[in-house]
């Protein structure tokens, strides 16, 4: 997203009908440490940040944190064709984390702010 906000596009269209859980690799790594500290745990653990967002909402937050004034307009998946189909809902349930008594994943806003600060000093 940051490379798209280079000032050459007056308006960016970003998909607003696909929902997911934006997640940083740092948040995943921290939770993996918690899981690995409990060798008796078995099963599939979904490691996604708390909260949900569309790609449009995610882009808006990225630009806000970066102090960019890039104009962003929502569009539909049909208006933004991709080589492979994308799911409308890629949200994952973190029930296994709760059942294992592990700490929750951070909210995606907080994880994104941490990433932006470390990568872009924003």
List each model region and its residues.
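NAD(P)-dependent short-chain dehydrogenase/reductase
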Residues: 1-20, 26-27, 33
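Residue-level signal for alpha-helix termini/capping positions
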Residues: 5-7, 36-40, 120
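Hydrophobic residues at beta-strand termini and immediately following loops
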Residues: 14-15, 47, 75, 108
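Short glycine- and hydrophobic/aromatic-rich loop-to-beta-strand nucleating segment
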Residues: 21-23, 90-91
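Non-catalytic, hydrophobic alpha-helical segments
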Residues: 28, 32, 47, 58, ...
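Mid/C-terminal beta-alpha module of Rossmann-like enzyme folds, strongest
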Residues: 31, 38-84, 88, 116
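C-terminal amphipathic/interface module of NAD(P)-dependent oxidoreductases
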Residues: 53, 88-122
């Amino acid at each position: 997203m940051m490379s798209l906000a280079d000032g050459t596009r007056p308006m960016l269209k970003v998909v607003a009908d696909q929902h997911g859980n934006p997640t940083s690799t740092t948040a995943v790594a921290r939770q993996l440490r918690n899981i690995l500290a409990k060798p008796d745990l078995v099963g599939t653990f979904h490691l996604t940040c708390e909260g949900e967002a569309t790609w449009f909402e995610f882009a808006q937050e990225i630009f806000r944190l970066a102090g960019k004034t890039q104009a962003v307009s929502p569009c539909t998946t049909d208006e933004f064709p991709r080589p492979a189909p994308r799911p409308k809902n890629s949200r994952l349930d973190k029930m296994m984390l709760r059942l294992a008594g592990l700490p929750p994943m951070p909210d995606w806003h907080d994880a994104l702010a941490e990433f932006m600060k470390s990568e872009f000093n924003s």
